[in-house]
Amino acid sequence: MSDFVKTMTIRALALVKSFSKSQKRLALKSYSDQDRTIWFYTPTNHGGLSFADMSSTQHRLVLSLVSSGLSTSGFNTVAAIMGLDNILDNLEDFKVNFKRERGRDPLLYYITIFGDPGSEKEWGWRLGGHHISLHYSIKGLKVLSFTPSFFGADPADSPLLGPHLHRPLASLEDLGRELFTSLSGTNLQSALISAIPPVD
């Protein structure tokens, strides 16, 4: 078994072992569950077990699992995005509630384990929440898929002390804009889906 898959499996098993019976009912699903193929990035219930319903120790176990599937820069980006809801809450004067106790809530990220980690059959996991959607599917010795994956940022930039901006997706945003502005003629027409961006 590759070190990458072995580490991911060990960390998934440690997380599952930490769950109470009630947590298991939320976090564990069969690999064939249709919920495994659904993804979105809105600040809503993504299904599974939320950070709000876990202990601090379990938060660490989830983040350890997430880090097993990402580079250091990838994990740092996910961690930065997960903290943006505090900044967004401040920008909105702490008034958005979405008919729940706290509208912008950095604890509303959800983990789901599909199937049985370490078995010979397919298994996988998903982390979803505001502007984060990560999916991994595994069988035996290899990762079958790590898509769909989505990283977003709201706000895209925010001021820090000194002449600095906090931009979790800076290099990706800048590269995308550079690519787009390099296009012209029919290439530009093909690339431009709509002149009006989506609401979110």
What are these regions (language model features)?
Residues 2, 34-200:
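Acidic/His-rich structured neighborhood in mature extracellular/periplasmic domains
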Residues 18-30:
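N-terminal regions that are enriched for targeting/export leaders
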Residues 1-18:
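N-terminal module-boundary/linker segments of secreted carbohydrate-active enzymes
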Residues 16-21, 131-133:
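Short, mixed-charge, low-aromatic patches
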